């Protein structure tokens, strides 16, 4: 997608899955990786530990040529697509691998235009042909605070991340088996990925989407100093993320290379969800305790009465000793984004799941 005439924006993403052990971070990510491996797409996949020089050398050897049919002609492109995956982010970003150097390299490659050149002690000058890096990683909530201590790194590196959080399992089954429908879905996904991999060209806005984009874009704040550094890094790229997610939504919908208003709505919605997750990452342990107290109060309501609808004023009375109105609104927004509740006017609708 051409952006303001200065550079092309590609829908590569850096995604960080954060949650406690057992919620399915690595398992769900691995399923997607394995499905991608079963396609014929020319995507280089590197998993877990690697040093910056080794990553540079791996990418320099991983350039691929791909043929596309475009406008009745055959177009041959040369680029370096890479999926870097870490089932535990601590295995990838460690003192042994050079956490600062690797985060700085990934930061630079996030929106790289054209070729990338660097120098290593072993091979000297290295050139990577049009790198396009997608990064998936999983970690515990405590890892960010304990290991990624540099605020400058957190602002630059995490500012390029879409953060997805989970606090509990959504499904429980004593015996998980693939059903015939699951097997068929897997085949359909592989087939769709093959079609997506053959797409070539530039995405365009539909008239309605372009109008929506302009309105939303000009509504975004210009001053990033009011937020902490972690969220300011994300906020400065909020528009980029909305575009990238809208493109990916459009790809999942069809092959016309047109971004519709619905595609953009989905992209903006996901940006808001991830931004709220990043804000929660900066919360103190005391703030997390308050969130859990509100969640527990809502759960208690539902266990005592059959109705899952709760009046906002009644909840405010119960929590007024340790949460003012503004703080409660922030907490309810977080719980709504997690899917635990739905707020309609002054009514809170509990959706669960409920923890014992």
Predicted features, each with a name:
Residues 1-356:
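Phosphate-handling catalytic cores of nucleic-acid transaction enzymes
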């Amino acid at each position: 997608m051409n952006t303001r005439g200065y550079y092309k924006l590609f829908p590569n993403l850096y995604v960080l899955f954060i949650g406690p052990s057992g919620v399915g971070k690595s398992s769900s990510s691995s399923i997607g990786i394995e499905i991608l491996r079963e396609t014929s797409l020319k995507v280089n996949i590197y998993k877990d530990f690697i040093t910056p020089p080794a990553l540079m050398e791996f990418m320099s050897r991983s350039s691929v040529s791909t043929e596309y049919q475009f406008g009745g002609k055959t177009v041959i492109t040369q680029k370096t697509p890479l999926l870097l995956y870490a089932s535990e982010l601590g295995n990838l970003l460690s003192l042994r691998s050079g956490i600062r150097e690797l985060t700085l390299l990934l930061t630079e490659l996030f929106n790289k235009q054209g070729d990338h050149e660097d120098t290593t002690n072993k091979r000297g000058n290295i050139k990577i042909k049009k790198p396009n890096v997608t990064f998936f990683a999983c970690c515990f909530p405590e890892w960010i605070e304990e290991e990624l201590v540099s605020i400058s790194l957190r602002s630059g590196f995490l500012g390029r991340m879409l953060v997805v959080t989970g606090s509990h399992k959504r499904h429980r089954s004593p015996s998980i088996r693939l059903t015939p429908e699951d097997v068929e879905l897997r085949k359909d996904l592989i087939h769709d990925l093959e079609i997506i991999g053959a797409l070539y060209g530039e995405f365009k806005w539909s008239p309605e989407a372009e109008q929506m984009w302009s309105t939303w874009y000009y509504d975004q704040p210009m001053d990033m100093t009011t937020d902490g550094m972690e969220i300011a890094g994300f906020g400065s790229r909020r528009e980029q993320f909305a575009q990238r997610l809208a493109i990916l939504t459009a790809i999942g919908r069809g092959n016309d290379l047109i971004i519709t208003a619905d595609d953009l709505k989905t992209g903006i919605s996901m940006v808001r969800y991830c931004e709220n997750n990043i804000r929660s990452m900066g919360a103190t342990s005391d703030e997390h305790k308050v969130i859990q107290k509100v969640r527990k109060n809502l759960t208690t309501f539902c266990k005592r009465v059959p109705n899952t609808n709760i009046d906002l004023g009644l909840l405010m009375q119960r929590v007024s000793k340790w949460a003012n109105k503004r703080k409660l609104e922030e907490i309810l927004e977080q719980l709504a984004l997690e899917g635990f509740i739905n707020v309609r006017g002054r009514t809170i609708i509990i959706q669960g799941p409920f923890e014992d």
